[in-house]
Curated annotation (Swiss-Prot):
It comes from Nitratidesulfovibrio vulgaris (strain DSM 19637 / Miyazaki F). Pathway: Metabolic intermediate biosynthesis; acetyl-CoA biosynthesis; acetyl-CoA from acetate: step 1/2. Keywords: ATP-binding, Cytoplasm, Kinase, Magnesium, Metal-binding, Nucleotide-binding, Transferase. Its main location: cytoplasm. Mg(2+). Can also accept Mn(2+). Its cofactor is Mg(2+); Mn(2+). It catalyses: acetate + ATP = acetyl phosphate + ADP. The lineage of its organism: Bacteria, Pseudomonadati, Thermodesulfobacteriota, Desulfovibrionia, Desulfovibrionales. Belongs to the acetokinase family. Mg(2+) binds at N7, E388. GO terms for biological process: acetate metabolic process; acetyl-CoA biosynthetic process. The gene is ackA. This is Acetate kinase. Pfam families: Acetate_kinase.
């Protein structure tokens, strides 16, 4: 049984074809610069294995349909294909940003679901239209294969009202659905399940803090296996300092910047989403570049690093109180899985929480879930690799089998 996972962006399609009998990717890839002149398709056969083979094509893709048609050509190619024909695709799982309160769990896509995704375009103007485009492409090219929407906000639907409401006039919530939704939910859910397995603890008894740290960053407080709070809000801008996003700020800065700089709301949104965070402080948004600059004595790179770490530490303290008895703190995603310097700085001097990491163990690289704390520490610190595509594929199968 093969499931095609699609993450459709405004000018891109990220995809992965997964064999659900082995839960391994047969192929994966990225179509870029759709509708922008010369496009690019990077296709990997047997990705992340010793037998990986990469194919790179440069050609124009007028729209998402053209891009996906080329992907189909590659995956069914007589010589390099991984399946004989597209009929071998059982289902298509879609990453969807925002389903609001109406869609509380993953659903088989129908006209009602598409209508809800469309209704939330004002709150997800970049992602929801692109997600719809991906769904429509799948419906056109794979009419035999049902589509399932797996929502970024789904895992956070268990937050209590006291956590997800903003202290604004309540009528704004009722009329405009202004509330905290949270994102990266697919990753947080996958990590929560994997942590329960790793610790040998029932999911409904698990209390953890998950730290998804990449170019985009978020954390979740998980109590009894359910999300009770998260750092992102009505958009992915709230919360931690990120690669190019500012995270938490005083909202009064918006009218202040309008007055002092003459910026429009759209211009301020661009600054806060694309020119702030690590990039705004030191001009770099890749943590590897920041570490290299720190080693050379770059004070702004050091400041950006310290600010990034400080926000994470502050939220760990906050969420520890929310969760109560902690079973683990879990790091995942690009920085969380691979950057021992960030993990060490985050966990430094956290005796009050019973955290004490082993520097030598922390510095070792591994693609497996692992402990990085010293033996006997009160709260384990774990690194657990995420796999959002597999989570989407597994959820897709569960939905179609009526088990979600």
């Amino acid at each position: 049984m093969n499931v095609l996972v699609i993450n459709s962006g405004s000018s891109s399609i990220k995809y992965q074809l997964i064999d659900m009998t082995t839960e391994k990717a047969l192929c994966s890839g990225l179509v870029e610069r759709i509708g922008e002149g010369m496009g690019k398709l990077t296709h990997k056969i047997k990705p992340d294995t010793d037998a990986e083979e990469k194919i790179v094509l440069e050609q124009a893709f007028a729209n998402h349909v053209e891009g996906m048609k080329k992907v189909v050509d590659l995956i069914t190619d007589a010589d390099k294909g991984v399946i004989a024909d597209k009929g071998e695709i059982y289902a298509v799982g879609h990453r969807v940003l925002l389903g609001g309160e109406e869609i509380k769990q993953s659903v088989k896509i129908d006209e009602w679901a598409k209508g809800i995704i469309r209704d939330y375009i004002p709150l997800g103007p970049l992602h929801n239209p692109a997600n719809l485009a991906g769904i429509e492409v799948a419906e056109e090219l794979f009419p035999h294969a049902p589509s399932v929407g797996v929502f970024d906000t789904e895992f956070h639907q268990t937050m209590p009202k006291k956590a997800y409401l903003y202290p604004l006039p309540y009528d704004l919530y009722k009329t405009l659905r202004i509330r905290r939704y949270g994102f990266h939910g697919t990753s947080h859910r996958y990590i929560t399940k994997k942590t329960a397995e790793f610790l040998g603890k029932p999911l409904d008894e698990l209390n953890i803090i998950t730290c998804h740290l990449g170019n985009g960053c978020s954390m979740a407080a998980v109590k009894n296996g359910r999300c009770v709070d998260t750092t992102m809000g009505i958009t992915p801008l709230e919360g931690l300092m990120m690669g190019t996003r500012c995270g938490d700020i005083d909202p009064a800065l918006v009218p202040f910047l309008m007055e002092k700089k003459g910026w429009s709301g759209a211009e301020i949104d661009t600054v806060m989403n694309k020119q702030s965070g690590l990039k705004g402080i030191c001009g770099m948004n890749d943590m590897r570049d920041i570490h290299a600059a720190r080693e050379k004595g770059d004070e702004m790179a050091e400041l950006a690093f310290q600010m990034f770490v400080y926000r994470i530490r502050k939220y760990i303290g906050s969420f520890a109180v929310v969760v109560g008895k902690l079973d683990a703190i879990v790091f995942t995603a690009g920085i969380g899985e691979n950057d021992d310097l960030v993990r060490a700085a985050v966990c430094k001097d956290m005796d009050i929480l019973g955290i004490d990491i082993d520097e030598a163990v922390n510095a070792k690289r591994s693609g497996q879930a692992r402990h990085i704390g010293k033996p006997g520490q009160r709260v384990p610190v774990l690194v657990v690799p995420t796999n959002e595509e597999l989570e989407i594929a597994q959820t897709t199968v569960a939905v179609l089998n009526g088990k979600n």
